[in-house]
Amino acid sequence: MKFGQLLKETLMYEYKYSYVNYDKLKKEIKRRNDQGGWSEEDESDFVELLEKELDKVYSFQKNKSAEVMERIRFCEEQTDEVVRRLDSDNPPNENDFAILETELTDIMATVHDLAKFSELNYTAFYKIIKKHDKHTGWILKPVFAARLNAKPFFKEQYDLLVVKLSKLYDFVRTRGSPIKGDSAAGGTQQNFVRQTTKYWVHPNNVTELKIYILKHLPVLVFNPNKEFAREDAAITSIYYDNDDLDFYLGRLEKREGAEAIRLRWYGNMDNNNIFVERKTHREDWTGEKSVKARFPLKEKYVNAFLRGDYTVEEAFAKMRKDGKKSLKEIESLERLAKEVQYTVLSRGMKPYVRSFYERTAFQLPGDARVRISLDTNLSLIREDGPSRAGNNWRRMDIGIDYPFDQLPDEDIVRFPYAILEVKLQTQFGQDPPEWVNNLVNSHLVEAVPKFSKFIHGVSTLFYDRVTLLPYWFPQMDIDIRKPATHTFIQGRSQSGTHSSSVSANVLTDSENTPIHADGDNYVDEESRIGSSSTRNDNSTFQTSDSFQELDERTNLLDISKRKGRDSFVAALNSRLKDIKDSFFLETVPKFEEPTEPTVIYEQKYVSPPGKRIYVPVRVEPKTYFALERTYLDYLRYSILMGSIGITLFSFAKTRSGILGAASFTLVALFAIFYSTFLYLWRAVNIAKHNAVRYDDRFGPTAICVITFAAISANVILNFNA
């Protein structure tokens, strides 16, 4: 389907006169080219026409955003009036709340439509400029990028609107009685299960996702008495590692006890409260859960603490004096601080990677049953080296001024997607809420089990120093957008086609080639970021690595397992078609030409020279039980053969009888030593997730042969005697 036709079918009817006149611009290029080539005057006229279209789109988007803010302010006034009437003689009735809810729902739809409006016009400008540069021979792309940056309708941030709408909608939905959190919700410590999964969200779907979630969960605001500002959502972490990248490898390979140490702060750089955190990975077979622990530390003491000059006793002296925490809690924090300090000093840890993102958290205050966080504008920055941090624990030449344009390309990776994390706490056998099911099974998200910002940062920023890459590494060059599976927000689209379902086609050219841009060009910024994040100039890999089915350590939903990882399987294996008994579904976007999908998935990936893709393998606890059962079966056989040998030896009166008894005893000893060696070898390889053969091709046959030999020898010796 041509983009012009697609634009007509997916635009909002109410906004149709404010869209880019794509057909007019396209015809203008064709008409002037047909008249004898493209002259300087033609270029000037076309740029002027393009400027008018940009002014039209930018003015409409700006005015519409102001209108939305005004409508929200009006709803806030109406809500304040309802609050005042709650305890009066004339309390609000159901109709008052229904009117407010209808208005808020309409505002949400408007915000959603505005986001889609910006997305579609952004794509239209890209398409027409690409067509211009291709057919005229004049390069307009870099020049017009500056004009777009001056009128950035496509960079509108809706976070403030989402927070305001969340607060209002939560009040109206609960009819003036906001639900208070229950810290014990979900069961006691003995009968509930925690489940966590991570997803990628394409930027085009972020606004729709936020609006859908806030209809069920309010945005968690830690300081409701303060007006929300963008810096309130900023979270910055400094990850530490040593020169051998041991902590990176440990976290990537999911080694038992693997640690990650980071220093984190919230908001601006002038925040004096730093949190030192340690994440420890635990394997399922240990019966323990992975844990994250942290303790606070003032910024002025961080350098001294990391050098060992500032002792743990000094760090917690004030906390002991204040008495706000129990002695047991303080001792636990001190023990953690000592362990972290010892690890940093003994293993030569230094700052390596900084992660920055803006987090929107959705949760009922104090209620841990459903917790959702969405991290946007994720940036991973090099923190190592004297030219950056020197002797300081963090570099000071940057703050939270995303997108950090002052940094060179080799120092930063701007992650192309938002990160959605869903945490559930439910009783055993209890299903998650239906709306959560709909969310994680929808086209808005792409499941990425065990995704790690630290691992991705090291693997991209230090690409030349690592040999193992995370399993999602090849996925970075594949468009994760999928056809719409649910209509979460009822917008004003003229047709029933959901704009996010066409995005994968819109942003892919007719030759099925992904869009990439260079330099400061505005065009398809997320594709530029994604492609540059690999730190590899060769788009074609050379050394083949086979990929097995991906699995995640903690499964959120059975259905999510089938649908959520669809494009991973399509990318890592062959394109799946007409599979009925598989866990995955095909999600190649198709419109009028189903035989020619506009998103192409590679049938096979090969890793770069000298690199290997590490695919996580889940080891079920029953694997160890099966290993133990096999070992016990061998021991049972050994006991039987040993008992026979000892019995024969007890009644042996002749030399042949003693030799016969000895043959059974030797068989028993051989079985004990062999089975013990095999058990230990298998246990070590399973714990290390080594890709070796675990079947015993020779052991059972050898046992049968020597058993037959022992019996035969005993018969022959007794017959001769």
From Swiss-Prot:
Q: Name one GO molecular function term.
A: ATP binding
Q: How does it assemble?
A: The VTC core complex is an integral membrane heterooligomer composed of at least the catalytic subunit vtc4 and the accessory subunits vtc1 and vtc2. vtc1 is a small membrane protein without hydrophilic domain. Vtc2 and vtc4 are related and have 2 hydrophilic domains that face the cytosol, an N-terminal SPX domain and the central core domain. The central core in vtc4 is the catalytic domain.
The coenzyme or cofactor needed here is: Mn(2+)
Phosphothreonine occurs at which residues?
T497, T534
* GO-annotated biological processes: energy reserve metabolic process; polyphosphate biosynthetic process; polyphosphate import into vacuole; vacuolar transport
| Domain SPX: start-end pairs | 1-146
PTM annotation (Phosphoserine): residues: S495, S501, S546
Could you tell me the gene encoding this protein? vtc4
Which of the residues are on side Vacuolar? 653-657, 719-721
Q: Does the keyword Zinc-finger apply?
A: no
Q: Which CDD domains match?
A: PolyPPase_VTC4_like, SPX_VTC2_like
Q: Where are the transmembrane segments?
A: 632-652, 658-678, 698-718
* Lineage of the species this protein comes from: Eukaryota, Fungi, Dikarya, Ascomycota, Taphrinomycotina
Protein name as catalogued: Vacuolar transporter chaperone complex subunit 4
Q: How does it sit in the membrane?
A: Multi-pass membrane protein
Q: Which residues form the active site?
A: K453
What organism does the UniProt record list as the source? Schizosaccharomyces pombe (strain 972 / ATCC 24843) (Fission yeast)
Supply the alphabetized keyword list. ATP-binding, Chaperone, Manganese, Membrane, Metal-binding, Nucleotide-binding, Phosphoprotein, Transferase, Transmembrane, Transmembrane helix, Vacuole
Task: Output the InterPro entries linked to this UniProt entry.
Answer: DUF202, SPX_dom, VTC_Complex_Subunit, VTC_domain, VTC_sf
